[in-house]
Regions:
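Polytopic alpha-helical membrane-helix bundles and their juxtamembrane interface segments
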Residues: 1-37, 82-89, 96-215
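Alpha-helical transmembrane segments of integral membrane proteins, especially early/N-terminal helices
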Residues: 30-38, 67-74
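Short, hydrophobic transmembrane alpha-helix segments
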Residues: 32-39, 55-61
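Hydrophobic/aromatic-rich structural module bridging two neighboring secondary-structure elements via a short loop
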Residues: 45-98
Length: 215
């Protein structure tokens, strides 16, 4: 799959590969469709997960690679929940209604997130340094990366359950990614993150309108 590494163009003196461009396009399309309450976002999401799997495999980012089956499972759950809602959760169109977490559920999620991030960060800090040396590249920022990863999985899960709160999680992910990319001196990915951010803000208000309409 060397053709995935074809340089499409350069931006800020850095090459943008075909795999980077495709993953950005499919990722943006997925959240764009989700923000507009389209079930087709899951089909694009399957392609996006496959592209990320290939990209992480080629770049030897095995910590990210092993999370893709989890993302795939969340995507399958989301497609089922959106298409086959319980009668009490069904909208007028027959799809899953937009709902919100209760304050108790939000408190639980906020308490769980740092615990999971610390645990996953510790595991990743061991990979390549004490465990599987030579197979897993050591991560210089394991805890920071794992905080973002846990946020992404949380946002995906909430989106699969069609919770309005997912867009707050996505906005936090976008802001964190934008900061990391800018600090790394990247040009293409900050632009992509800004597009994610704009879509996240729009979707936050769009889903709130749906929630109020379907109450």
């Amino acid at each position: 799959m060397d053709w995935f590494n074809t340089i499409i163009f350069e931006l800020g003196g850095r090459p943008v590969l075909l795999i980077d461009l495709l993953s950005a396009m499919f990722g943006l399309t997925t959240v764009f469709l989700a923000g507009r309450n389209r079930k087709s976002n899951f089909y694009v999401g399957y392609m996006y997960t496959a592209l990320l799997f290939v990209m992480f495999w080629q770049k030897n980012l095995y910590a990210n690679l092993i999370l893709q089956p989890i993302s795939l499972g969340i995507n399958i759950l989301g497609q089922y929940r959106w298409s086959q809602p319980k009668k009490s959760q069904e909208s007028a169109s027959g799809d899953l209604k937009v709902s919100m977490l209760s304050w108790g559920q939000r408190t639980f999620v906020l308490a769980l997130l740092p615990t999971l991030a610390l645990l996953w960060g510790w595991l990743m800090s061991m990979m390549g340094t004490r465990w599987f040396v030579g197979y897993f590249p050591a991560n210089p920022l394991p805890y920071l990366d794992c905080c973002v990863t846990v946020l992404i999985l949380t946002a995906q899960t909430l989106s699969a359950l069609k919770k309005w709160d997912c867009w707050i999680a996505w906005l936090l992910v976008n802001i964190a990614n934008l900061t990391l990319y800018l600090k790394a001196g990247l040009v293409f990915m900050p632009i992509v993150s800004c597009l994610y951010l704009v879509n996240g803000i729009w979707s936050l208000f769009s889903w709130y309108k749906l929630y109020r309409h379907e109450e």
